[in-house]
């Protein structure tokens, strides 16, 4: 570039005409510049202005995502609500949805030799219950006796909102509907499981479950899901005199069928001691059978 400029100026340099500074191209500013300045001038970085996305679009996306999340959570909650059709099948589905149901028997292995279960389908006199407790203690010295009353378990569930069957029991009570098959067994099973995880649960224990089972279905479910029954104790006086006072014919027949179910497998024992003068003889016979 500098050579070209000299070539154009050569005729003028050898001519006699006076060359004025105004006729000479002004290249001094270019020649005096440093390479860095030349590069800066020829390679200017042009910053492109970014397009600003509309704020309303982001707000719209956030609202849509929030609604979708709320809808998802609401559906998950609806799936865990209490079933309105409380048949046995529906109750089994309720157990599976809430994570209660277990396919294996609760008491098995080492616990089956440490725990024994005695059921009393119907009892109205607590004095009789105390007598049975004392007989078991004298029969198995050093063995703990644990009494389970399903009616107390139901009240505990009703009073504590944090318990699993709280809302189910209140709905059944409001609708005046009977308890579905398997509900009482589920409560008893839960109580036994809680006991087995305590310090007392590490010792040998005789369980007495009063006023249970009162249907054959509950008896079968207990032996399938919880443990085998050692003896089903039938209080002759209460079954004959007290049962008709507090239960209708259908309920009486269901409880009597429980007696027949355990009697068919040789695990039912009828106790006839109330107002019986031969108490000592009764105790000897009972201890042999237990």
UniProtKB/Swiss-Prot annotation:
The organelle targeting sequence, given as a residue range: 1-26
Membrane topology, from the record: Single-pass membrane protein
UniProt superkingdom: Eukaryota
InterPro entries: P-loop_NTPase (IPR027417)
Name of the protein in question: Altered inheritance of mitochondria protein 36, mitochondrial
Entry keyword Transmembrane: yes
Transmembrane segments: 55-74
Lineage of the organism: Eukaryota, Fungi, Dikarya, Ascomycota, Saccharomycotina
Position of the signal peptide: none
GO cellular component terms listed in the entry, alphabetical order: mitochondrial membrane
Main location: mitochondrion
């Amino acid at each position: 570039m500098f050579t070209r400029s000299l070539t154009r100026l050569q005729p003028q340099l050898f001519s006699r005409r006076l060359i004025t500074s105004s006729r000479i191209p002004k290249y001094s500013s270019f020649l005096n510049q440093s390479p860095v300045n030349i590069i800066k001038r020829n390679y200017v970085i042009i910053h492109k202005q970014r397009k600003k996305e509309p704020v309303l679009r982001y707000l719209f996306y956030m609202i849509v995502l929030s609604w979708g999340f709320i809808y998802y959570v609401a559906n998950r909650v609806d799936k865990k609500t209490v079933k309105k059709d409380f048949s046995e099948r529906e109750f089994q589905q309720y157990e599976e949805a809430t994570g209660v149901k277990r396919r294996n028997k609760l008491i098995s292995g080492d616990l089956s030799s440490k725990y024994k279960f005695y059921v009393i389908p119907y009892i109205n006199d607590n004095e009789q219950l105390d007598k049975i407790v004392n007989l078991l203690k004298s029969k198995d010295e050093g063995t703990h006796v644990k009494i389970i009353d399903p009616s107390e378990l139901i009240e505990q569930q009703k009073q504590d909102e944090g318990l699993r069957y709280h809302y189910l029991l209140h709905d059944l009570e409001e609708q005046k509907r009977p308890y579905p098959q398997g509900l009482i067994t589920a409560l008893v099973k839960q109580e036994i499981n809680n006991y087995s995880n305590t310090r007392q649960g590490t010792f040998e224990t005789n369980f007495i479950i009063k006023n249970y089972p009162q249907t054959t279905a509950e008896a079968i479910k207990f032996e399938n899901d919880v443990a085998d029954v050692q003896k089903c104790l039938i209080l002759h006086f209460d079954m004959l005199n007290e049962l008709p006072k507090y239960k209708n014919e259908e309920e009486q027949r269901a409880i009597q069928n429980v007696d027949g179910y355990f009697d068919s497998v040789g695990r039912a024992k009828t106790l006839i001691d109330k107002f019986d003068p031969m108490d000592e003889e009764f105790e000897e016979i009972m201890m042999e059978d237990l």
